[in-house]
Amino acid sequence: NRELGKRDSMTTASTTDLALMAHLLRRAGFGADRDQLERYAEKSYEDVVDDLLNPERFDEPEDEVLSRFYPHLHANKDNPAVWNGRWFYRMVNTERPLEEKMTLFWHGVFATGWTKSEHTPTMVQHIQMLRTNGMANFRTLLLGISRDPAMIFWLDNNENHGSSINENYGREILELFSMGIGNYTEDDIKNAARAFTGWTYEQPIPLYPYGQRDVEFLFRADDHDNDEKTFLGHTGNLDGNDIIDIIATQEATARFIGRHLYNFFVADEAQVPAWSIEPPVDPAAIDDLVKTWMDSDADIRAVLRTLFTSDWFKAARFKRVKSPTEFVAAVLKLSGDYREPDTDLHKLEGTIVAMGQKLMDPPSVEGWHTGKEWIDGGTLTERVNYAINTLNDPEKPGVRAIVDRIRSGGDATSPAQFVDSLLDLVGPLELESETRDTLLAHAEKDGPLEWGSDESASASTERVVQLLTLVVSAREYQFN
């Protein structure tokens, strides 16, 4: 295994290269600090994409280190906040960022929640299944979802019997997990449900009286409907595996999942319920993804390669509102917090809940509404306060690195140089001219940065930190 972004040469990346690489790492991961960004940019864009798409080349985060800080996990496995804290640790420290980003992506598509089961080990299994299969063939992923105890309980497939079907999973696998409304019939839903009869789990999930042990998939052959079924024009004694295989070959599936990928990685789309009546933001981009899906036989990795190497992806900078998870992870990457395990990791769950998102517990099977719906007066205030409180400390390693970079520019740094240098180090971040003018006016109040004496260096450090908090409070910082 090797270090992601490891230097292959001593070439210096151009500002353009850095901006493009920063864009890729914001979307295919959770951002990068400046040192990481420069290491990435010493490789070609295509090579970095290839590394991102092949996470097995790199070591996983050291979960065993976290276990030493959380010994109570072994005795008490029912606290979702602790597991979400561990997930944040992975997001911030992983050498496999796209693996974690795809886990978050699929968590929104295959929305499954803790509230119904109140069984944390099963939700942890569910997230790990998404992580393992997130860039596999879509068949493999959809099979994993269909056999997942958390999903089975969430959509009542444990109550789907050969003698009495429950259509919940049969409906949602078509409406929300693959094809979208308008591409199937009510008979297709019913026959899909029949095909998944007998797909259940080995023991009831709820917390009491069954305890907090892991749950496994179980197929009950005696509870399965073995009669002939017709699904999307295919007739036979179909079972769940057949349904999944048929779904994966449909152009409607390629188009629906492609639009999800575009919405998550490229630019904000309308909310999913409107997709049957509102066209995509960029139909040609969706066509590109559909073609790769069909040509590759539903290979998610191939579709992602098409997406990340396309001109329309490279041009779509700051076109998505960060989700609460993305926002907090980006601030943590900037501050350098949690580079080592910390017993406060679990508090991050409360932070993102205040911003409108609770990992492992989406509001419904529809998942979270995205884009501008993440933002209202309350959630924006939570974001700004969190960013300011986190970054308003020059002793944090990420903040100290920013101060040192600006100081290395020499004495008597002009206000304009100060503002532009900071925007470059935070992003590079693109601002509206009005926002930049506001920052410049603030910087001009105290003149050039001076570093010649201890007193002036201390004052300049305070000014850098203060301007940094203003930058992350800007409207533009809410965009990914």
For each predicted feature, which ranges?
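Short, Lys/Arg-enriched N-terminal segments with co-localized hydrophobic residues
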Residues: 1-9
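Active-site substrate-binding loop specific to GH73 endo-beta-N-acetylglucosaminidase modules
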Residues: 7, 83-87, 119-340, 478
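Flexible, low-complexity segments enriched for small/polar residues
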Residues: 12-17, 21-34, 250, 254, ...
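Short, compositionally biased low-complexity segments
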Residues: 18-27, 59-63, 75-78, 164-168, ...
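Alpha-helix boundary/capping and short turn/kink residues
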Residues: 30, 42, 96-97, 135, ...
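N-terminal accessory alpha/beta regions
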Residues: 34-133
